[in-house]
Every structure is written in C-alpha cells, then in structure tokens.
C-alpha cells in the first residue's frame, strides 16, 4: 500500500470518528484524554475537529454551525461529508466498540508517525512530547471504550 492509500485510510478513519462524535456524545468523554484536534490531518479535518471539540467543551453540539463556518462551497460540502460518513453496519455493541477503538488507535498512531517525521533533531521538547504521546498510545490500547 502506498502513502496515498494510507493517507486515504487515515482520512476515512478521521471522518468515521467525527461522524461518531456527532452522533453519540458519550464517545467524546471517553476519547477526549487521548485524541485532540491536533491528531487530525491539516486543513478542514483539523479545523472541523477543533470546532467540534470546542462545542463539546461549551456543552452544545451543533454540526450545522460548524458547517456554516466554512463559507467556501467546496469546503462546506466536504465538512458536511465529514459528519455524515457512511459507517458499515456493525451489528453488536461489541463490534462498534472494537471498530471505534481501532479507529482511535489508527488516528493517534498516524499523528505520532507524522510528528516523528516532522520533528527537528534538536527539538528536545518535541521529542519529550512524542515519548509522552507514545506512552499514551500504550495506555489507550488497554482502555475499554463502552458505547452503551
């Protein structure tokens, strides 16, 4: 699989997570300590995630307000798609929890890989943050996300 395919897979994971966050507010409480808007790809993904996370902190989820933030027609359409990604039918709660966990891990792992590639060799503070992020990733693997 090439870098392009991997990037598309990550974007799909990010869309799925944003869709889940909009459709089930309980999920945010379980992932907020592990995933931040900075874990999303640059551009509209990160911006939309940032606005959504801010709405969670303010206690009022309103995807339409987020979409209205993007005035460019093309961006507006893409953001609408972010919140309405078709998620394959997962029949059991357990399947949903497993898929959610895999999605969160994939996004966090990609975020760490990207930060590692872009890290300046002399950036000790950045290196320290990466080490902490990798430890969080290990903790995250032990976490059980419950959606019922």
Describe each model-derived feature in a short phrase.
Residues 53-148:
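Bacterial replisome coupling helices
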Residues 1-60, 112, 116-119:
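Non-catalytic protein-protein interaction segments used by genome-maintenance enzymes to assemble
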């Amino acid at each position: 699989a090439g870098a392009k395919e991997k990037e598309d897979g990550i974007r799909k994971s990010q869309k799925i997570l944003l869709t889940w966050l909009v459709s089930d507010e309980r999920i945010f409480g379980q992932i907020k300590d592990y995933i931040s808007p900075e874990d999303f790809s640059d551009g509209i993904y990160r911006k939309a995630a940032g606005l959504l996370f801010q709405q969670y902190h303010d206690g009022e989820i309103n995807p339409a307000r987020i979409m209205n933030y993007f005035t460019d027609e093309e961006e507006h359409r893409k953001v609408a798609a972010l919140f309405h990604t078709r998620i394959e039918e997962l029949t059991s709660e357990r399947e949903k929890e497993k898929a959610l966990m895999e999605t969160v891990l994939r996004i966090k792992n990609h975020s760490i890989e990207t930060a590692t590639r872009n890290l300046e060799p002399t950036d000790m503070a950045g290196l320290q943050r990466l080490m902490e992020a990798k430890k969080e990733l290990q903790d995250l693997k032990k976490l059980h996300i419950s959606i019922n």
